[in-house]
Amino acid sequence: MTEQVLPSLRAHYPIRETPEDTGIFGYSLGGLAALYMAYESPEFGLVGCLSGSLWYEGFMPWAESRRLASPGARVYLSLGRKEEKTRNPYLCKIGDCYRREEELLTQQLGASRVTMTWHDGGHATEVPRRMLLGLETLLKPPAL
C-alpha cells in the first residue's frame, strides 16, 4: 500500500501528501487491514474500520502493545449491535474487541479523534449507508 499504491496515486494525481489528508478505509476483513495499516504506517491520518474483523486471533494483544503510527490520526469505528450475538466462538468476541479498541485509541488520540458508532442490525445491514457516514465523519474538518 505505502510502497506501490500511494506513490502511484501521487505520481498520477495532484493529491495532498500529508497524513491528515490521507486515509484508509475498509469493511470486514478490509476494516481490520485498514486498522493494521494505521498501526504500521504514519501515512494514514484518517482511518475507517467498519465491522472490522478485530476478533482475528492475535490482533487485539498485538494492538494493545502498539500505538497508531500517526499520532494525530482520526479514527472512525462502526459495528452492528447484532454482530456479537452469535454462537460462533470467534465472532461473538467482536463487541468486546471493538469496545477495547475504542478505549485504546481514545487513550492514545483523545476522545475528539475517535468516533465509535453502533448501528442497528448485523454485519451486512445498511453497508452503503454506514460507509457513507464513516466517510462523511472522517472528511469533515476536525473540531478545534
Where are these regions (language model features)?
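Non-catalytic cap/lid and distal C-terminal segments of serine-dependent acyl enzymes
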Residues: M1-L144
